[in-house]
A protein has these predicted regions:
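Extended, non-catalytic subsegments within catalytic or DNA/protein-binding/adaptor domains
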Residues: 1-199
Length: 199
């Protein structure tokens, strides 16, 4: 669940794009120095423009010397490596996300189940910090949070749209932009408080 959530919140990709990520050599490439990884989905995206076709996910390892003690535990590159190692013995599919229980053990995970993983991770994170989970939270909520935080930190709108596979900035401004510094339920995601910064 953790790696699914971290990829969702750091990439702003649709669940279909995350579900289509592959372990094939042409779709997953680690930086030689271990500083990051590039992943490509194995399907055609919803937005079929030259800009969005086969748009990769580029992840960079969090700085292990950061003053925030939890940063290393929230690093998507670290989590991805751990997940790949943990599923190596059961894997029956090149798809990145595979089932780890039930009759489909080791087989490709469905989009619906992947959505549940992300929602379960959010719910667990709130519970671990002693807070009730947001009502009506969806897997899609990660796209609003990820892109809104990016905008708040000065990332150009064109770069945000490219990462989220949106054809026009209007999609973000009308449907996804939220006030993550205010009372938006998921605004505190990946923003540790002093009470839970060591978890």
């Amino acid at each position: 669940m953790k790696v699914a959530f971290l990829l969702a919140i750091t990439s702003a990709k649709r669940v279909g794009e995350l579900q289509a990520l592959s372990m094939a050599e042409t779709c997953l490439r680690w930086n030689p120095d271990g500083s990051g990884v590039v992943l490509w989905p194995t399907f055609l995206p919803k937005v079929l423009s030259r800009t969005h076709l086969n748009q990769p996910i580029r992840l960079t390892r969090f700085d292990s010397t950061s003053e925030e003690g939890s940063s290393e535990l929230l690093c998507p590159v670290r989590a991805l490596k751990a997940y790949i190692a943990a599923t190596a013995s059961i894997r029956q599919s090149e798809q990145l996300f595979v089932c780890h229980d039930g009759p489909n053990w080791g087989c490709a995970l469905s989009k619906q189940r992947l959505s549940h993983w992300v929602i379960d991770a959010i719910t667990h994170a709130y519970g671990a910090s002693g807070r009730p989970p947001p009502s009506g939270v969806r897997c899609h909520s990660t796209r609003s949070v990820a892109t809104s935080w990016a905008a708040l930190r000065g990332v150009p709108l064109e770069a945000i749209c490219a990462a989220a596979s949106w054809a026009t900035p209007g999609t973000f401004t009308r449907f996804y932009r939220v006030n993550v510094t205010g009372h938006y339920p998921m605004g505190a995601v990946l923003r540790p408080s002093s009470a839970d910064s060591k978890e």
